[in-house]
Structure formats: C-alpha cells, structure tokens
Regions:
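Amphipathic alpha-helical substructures
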Residues: 79, 200-281, 286
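Intrinsically disordered, low-complexity linkers and stems that provide flexible hinges
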Residues: 1-29, 33, 308-344
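Beta-strand-rich binding/interaction modules
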Residues: 257-258, 273, 277-335
Length: 344
C-alpha cells in the first residue's frame, strides 16, 4: 500500500467486551470532543461524524451530557470511564458498540423522525436507547441469548427513567404506557437455553413495562431506585443468568417476586384482572380475581375517587365491600401496572 495514501489507526479497549460490541468504521470523518465533568473525574466525549454534518452534529449532540447525568443518577457511573464515551455516524440506525456507539438517526427526533416512539417528545431515541446499553448489555451481559431480556428490557426501561429525569413523572407515565403499543404477546420473552434461541421481541417493551409494574408493586421509590442502581453497580463488567437478576430482586426487596417475573417472561400472556360489581341495597361489592399462572402473587391498584387502594387477588373469586359510591369513580390503575382488564 502506498504510505502516502494510507493511514494506520490503533485502538485499545481496556475493559471486558462482547464480540458483537467490536466494530469498524470507515468514512470521511471529522472529530470533535467534549467532556463531562464529574465530582471526582472527567469523562471524555468523542464524536466522529461525516465532514458535512459537523455543525448539525455539534448542535444535536448537546443532549448527550444531560442524558449521561440522568443515567448516572439511576445506574451509577458510566461503566467505561477509561475508554470514554463516543458516537460515530453510521449508515444504519444504531448499535450499542461499546464506547463507540453507532449513530445513524439522521439528527432527527424520535426514531428517524417518528416521534410515536418517544410519545411525541423531541429527544433522539437512538442516542438514548443505545447509550442505555452501556449499562445494560455491555457492562452487564447475559450468559445466554435466551436471557436477552436483561439487555433489552432494562435498556428500554432506561428510556423511561431518562424521560422521568428530563421531563417529569407524568411524562414518564405517558411514555411507558406508550410502549404498550409495541407489545404483541406473540410468544414468551425467555427462550430455550443452550441452543442459541432468542425469545419474543416483546423483551424490549414488555420488559420495560414489567419493570415499571414492579416499581409500583414495591411502592417505595427510594428503595426501588436503590435496587436498580445496586444491580447496575454490583454486577458491572460481568456476565450473569436472568435467574441471578430475579434472585437479586427477591433478596434486595425482601419479597418473592418470582411469579411476577415468570408471568411476564416465561409466558406470552400478561395477567388479566377480572371483576364485576354486586349491588346490595345502596352498597356495592367488588368481586374479583386474577386470570394468570398458578400462584400468581401481585397486588392490584385502583382508585375510588382520589383514594388509592390495593388488594391482593388470587385465582379464586374474592369479595370486597366498597360501600356506597359512584361507579364512575372506580378506576383500575393500569397506567401503573401492565395488565389486561376484563369486566364481567
């Protein structure tokens, strides 16, 4: 090769890395950089974009630093400090290549301009989702593709927490409930182990909605966020099985959440809350049960007016006296729980 026309570049990765996270980019790139100053150190931010997109990229990538600050709030420090954070313009939409994220969202909001993915919020979906993978998928990696929900469920949930951090709690609720539109319930999320089997693509949105459901089951946000950050920091730079994640949750929250994980991950259907009203004089009783797997154990949240209540259905019919009230004031909080509702 004519040395005048060739150039050799050497790159070093100082952390464990999955084989699929290694990539090669070749293009007419220009480089610009920034830093994220933190309490005890500085994270380098490097951007490689096609030369004619420099000005556009410099403006568009302003969203990176506040996003990283949100993720560090919930998941702990960026897990690849020594290698830095980078976005590299690519010919495809995106991929979570470790410390060298492929970016091809055309400097548009949403998913290549489609803000249905972002519940009409104007952030860049690819930047946020692929960056979430630095914690979920790159730092913490499943041992088997059958447990890929650990990557995609937690990463898709990272979008939800980003929205809460940047836009507030109510926008977060709108965002996470918008994810229901992408759930098909076609087959189980967890697939057969040791045979290179990947489960339903529902692992993305259903995984996120399951985690939001668990947050409301726990019903203690400071404890919930401590548990999420603890998982991200204690298991960083390691591989694990999905059952280890479930066991961690059970220990940390001192609850047996196994049946909730089983319902959402090992079966295609989500739990169904079945109910009816029975009138006795001027009073009403609520007759209710779960249609779910055996021994399914999860509270049901509902409001009567401004009062929030929790009940613990089983597969058997149960009865709760509600007294005299207007049935229009009865609201099942399926914005907090990912469930189906059947009124009989």
């Amino acid at each position: 090769i004519d040395n005048v026309l060739s150039r050799k570049s050497s790159w070093f990765v100082s952390y464990p890395i999955n084989s699929y996270n290694v990539t090669l980019y070749i293009g007419d790139y220009i480089h610009f950089s920034d830093v994220l100053v933190r309490e005890n150190d500085t994270l380098s931010l490097d951007y490689y974009v096609l030369s004619y997109n420099k000005e556009k990229a410099q403006n568009h990538f302003n969203q990176v630093k506040p996003m990283l600050e949100c993720f560090e709030k919930y998941f702990g420090p960026y897990p690849f400090l020594n290698d830095g954070y980078a976005l590299i313009e690519s010919s495809y939409l995106g991929m979570e290549h470790q410390s060298a994220i492929a970016y091809g969202n055309n400097y548009l909001p949403g998913y290549n301009g489609n803000t249905n993915y972002t519940a009409d919020l104007d952030f860049d979906f690819i930047i946020v989702h692929e960056t979430g993978h630095e914690w979920w998928g790159n730092s913490i990696t499943s041992n088997d593709i059958a447990d890929m929900w650990v990557h995609e469920g937690f990463c898709t949930y990272s979008e939800v927490l980003y929205v809460e951090c940047m836009y507030g709690y109510q926008k977060m609720l709108e965002y996470v409930n918008n994810q229901k539109n992408r759930v098909r319930n076609d087959k189980a999320v967890i697939c057969d182990f040791h045979v290179n089997c990947k489960g339903s693509s529902d692992m993305y949105s259903k995984g996120s909605l399951m985690l939001n459901t668990l947050r409301n089951v726990i019903n203690n946000d400071s404890l919930w966020f401590a548990g999420i950050k603890g998982l991200a920091t204690q298991k960083k730079h390691s591989t694990l099985d999905g059952v280890e994640v479930i066991n961690y949750f059970n220990r940390f929250f001192n609850l047996d959440l196994s049946k909730i994980f089983e319902q959402y991950l090992s079966h295609k259907d989500i739990p169904e809350f079945e109910y009816k009203f029975q009138k006795k004089g001027r009073s009403y009783s609520l007759i209710y049960r779960w249609n779910a797997i055996n021994d399914f154990d999860m509270p049901l949240i509902f409001n009567v007016g401004i009062n929030e209540k929790r009940i613990f259905p089983s597969s058997d019919w149960q009865e709760l006296s509600l007294g005299s009230f207007d049935k229009k004031d009865f609201v099942i909080r399926d914005d907090l729980l990912f469930i189906n509702i059947k009124k009989t």
